[in-house]
From Swiss-Prot:
Segments passing through the bilayer: 11-31, 35-55, 80-100, 101-121, 135-155, 175-195, 202-222, 226-246
Originating gene: uppP
Function description: Catalyzes the dephosphorylation of undecaprenyl diphosphate (UPP).
Entry similarity comment: Belongs to the UppP family.
Top-rank lineage group of the source organism: Archaea
UniProt-listed Enzyme Commission number(s): 3.6.1.27
Keyword Zinc-finger among UniProt keywords: no
Intracellular or extracellular location(s): Cell membrane
Keyword Signal among UniProt keywords: no
Keywords from the named record: Cell membrane, Hydrolase, Membrane, Transmembrane, Transmembrane helix
Name this protein carries in UniProt: Undecaprenyl-diphosphatase
GO molecular function: undecaprenyl-diphosphatase activity
Amino acid sequence: MEELILGIVQGLTEFLPISSSGHLAIFTAIFNSTPDVGYFAFLHLATFLAVLIFVKSEVFEIVNGISKKDNEYINLASKLVLSTIPAVIVGLCFGDFIESVFSSTFLIGVFLSITGILMLLSDKLNQNLKTIKSIPYLDAMIVGIFQAFSVLPGISRSGTTLFAALFLGMKKEDAVKYSFLMGLPVTFGAGILELQKVSFSAEQLFGFVISFLTGLLGLYLVKKMVIGGKLKIFGYYCFLASFFVLMFL
């Protein structure tokens, strides 16, 4: 039952800007069990597949453009790679510290508050000038730096990258696409690195499937909420979750 619940939590919260890692750690604390970082990473592979399906047309365009040596798509792919570098460096260099943070409900509560603030601010950003193809390399690096902070449980990956992209003047729909696309290698890498720690029990595999299905639902919801200018709803939720964690866990 625990694996099923964690699968649902991972699928829904991976793309909603409320921090999937933070919620997995919270529910683990509620279950009074030891955080299984390996299983958490395994669930990331499920949501990786979900987002790959969700942005399959964009991925196909990029791959097709690169094969035809189209500079526009080569530059876009280069920017996406650049955006992933900070998170990769942080994950490799500070993996043990990050794993220890999963056991600190106090820090998770604080980080959820930070995510909440970013979501409230995001709704006020409406420059809507740049597309995923037109953003400069510097912007790609800045968005990547924001993503690097999301290795901490409670800091939302989609939340930080959406905030950064919108702050830098990207159109809302393009900000969503860029956030999902740049998250593909990070999410895949996180799952692969910890795969050897997974026992592949029937319960864990079922949790994987559930995480994939609920991930598709989460992707639809976040796209609709960003375009509709309703990110503040997630901000209020993060504040409530933070209060609950700090007061009761």
